[in-house]
Amino acid sequence: LPPVADRIPQQPLTVDLAALGREPGQHGGEIDILMARGKDTRLMTVYGYARLIGYNPNMALQPDILGSVENKENKAFTLHLRAGHRWSDGHPFTSADFRYFWEDMALNEMLSPFGPPEKLVVNGKPARVEILDELTVRYSWDEPNPYFLPALAGARPLYIYAPAHYLKQFHASYQDQAKLNEEVEFAGVRNWAGLHTRYGHQYKFDNPDLPTLQPWINTTHPPSERFVFERNPYFHRVDTNGLQLPYIDRVLVNIGSAGLIPAKAGAGESDLQARYLRLDNYPFLVEGGERNGFNVHLWKRGVGSQMALYPNLNSVNPAWRALVRDIRFRRALSLAIDREEINQVVYFGLV
């Protein structure tokens, strides 16, 4: 590999760990996590959380992959890329990747039969996409699109770029038809669009050959009982000491039975686990932590409540239908629910 200085952007994103209440680390080591299905590789896209623009711990949006963003009244967004940023295979990440997504994917009837992603459409009108230079792209609409930036920051983000240098080999506009036909037959898909979709799905994270901007790279072809993710040598973040992130060399995703994951986690077979754990697992996980030297944390969730009741407003019984449609009844029902007792009995007094 080239020296680190040649593998990171000219102005990388510097992460101040001390400001986050953490300490700088060192390179090395690996993390074991447990998953139940091969397609759970997509969760590495969630956990890695490299986004064009992302949420910080205070839930404020800030540039991440992007160097900066100009927002004009939620109608025009000018995105500035980081000079020198590269895909995980070392190829430059530029506005050409945004052009490819828009012109060759979003506007292609074979790849996007229903048109561009809905977050790029406002009142039936798609975005105007301007490639201003190698590092600058602008998206604009006649009316405000307040959902654009949050969509880019989502757990399953809105992708508006794709690795053009890799995906063109599967696109009818760039590849010889005879070669495409061979690839289609080998992959067992219906046409070149199916081929392009299979090998180009960034969120699924199941194609080791697909270049990525995430902190770790999938190195394992499915199906497998273990997926190995290795550190991206071209990742765009560094710590305040100049060490390239992430610190961890490898993440090992071990596939097993969903019902056994809480027990395995309690036995210390996972270094970091949230998926497939429930609140009723909490007592024995705490006990397992005391035996095996790990900590169990509770975190706030973005949902309104752990459970919800939905009275049937369309009951066939006219008397019952009239009752539940009366707002006074629904308010009384809400007041009658003993939330504290439910908390103590069902949730161990933790919510």
Give names to the regions the model predicted.
Residues 156-161, 165-172, 200-204, 211-216, ...:
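Structured beta-strand-rich cores of soluble
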Residues 54-57, 68-78, 82-117, 122-130, ...:
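Extracytoplasmic/periplasmic ligand-capture domains
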